[in-house]
């Protein structure tokens, strides 16, 4: 898959999950706006990892609270994401790059894997709240859309 890194951003799981989190209404609206703009501008990419994590996170119980979504609704939302955005899949290079990211930046495994997708596919930006906002990791800059809105 060829990705135009001048316009593409990689979306982390937390952005996808916040779209359905009614306990954080401002972040929910901000996350939905990120996806709306990304769909219109065709600028967002979703890593396969985020799709897997999205279904897991939205369908599991949260302590004594119900899941964010019933299983069937999470599946429907995942289908909508698959239909709306290009999904990037891992390969050996992504895996090896993730190991380098763990060593170079001391990332946790899933963060390293997310970063590796961006490095491998030539995407210059990750949208996430799980990294340091504005920092460059190799050729990839992290942007936390919630910081920009004063929500972080």
Question: Which functions belong to the PLM regions below?
Answer:
Residues 77-80, 84-96, 110, 133-152:
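Short acidic, glycine/proline-enriched helix-loop-strand junctions
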Residues 45-48, 127-128:
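Short beta-strand segments at enzyme active-site cores
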Residues 1-46, 63-73, 149-152:
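Short, well-structured N-terminal submotif of metal-dependent ribonuclease cores
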Residues 1-4, 115-152:
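Acidic, PIN/NYN-like endoribonuclease modules and their adjacent C-terminal/linker elements
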Residues 14, 55-56:
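Amphipathic alpha-helical repeat scaffolds of TPR domains
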Residues 58-85:
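Helix-adjacent hinge/juxtasegments
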Residues 3-4, 84-126:
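Active-site neighborhoods of divalent-metal-dependent phosphate/nucleic-acid chemistry enzymes
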Residues 47-51, 73, 94, 114:
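Short, conserved alpha-helical segments within structured domains
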């Amino acid at each position: 898959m060829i990705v135009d890194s001048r316009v593409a951003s990689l979306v982390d799981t937390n952005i996808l999950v916040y779209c359905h989190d009614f306990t954080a209404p401002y972040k929910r609206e901000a996350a939905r706006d990120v996806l709306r703009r990304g769909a219109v501008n065709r600028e967002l990419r979703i890593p396969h990892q985020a799709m897997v994590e999205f279904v897991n996170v939205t369908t599991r119980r949260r302590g004594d609270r119900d899941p964010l979504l019933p299983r069937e609704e999470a599946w429907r939302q995942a289908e909508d994401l698959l239909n709306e955005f290009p999904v990037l899949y891992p390969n050996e290079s992504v895996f090896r790059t993730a190991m380098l990211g763990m060593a170079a930046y001391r990332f946790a495994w899933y963060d390293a894997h997310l970063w590796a997708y961006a490095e491998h596919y030539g995407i210059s930006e990750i949208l996430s709240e799980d990294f340091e906002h504005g920092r460059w990791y190799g050729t990839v800059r992290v942007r936390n859309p919630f910081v920009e809105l004063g929500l972080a």
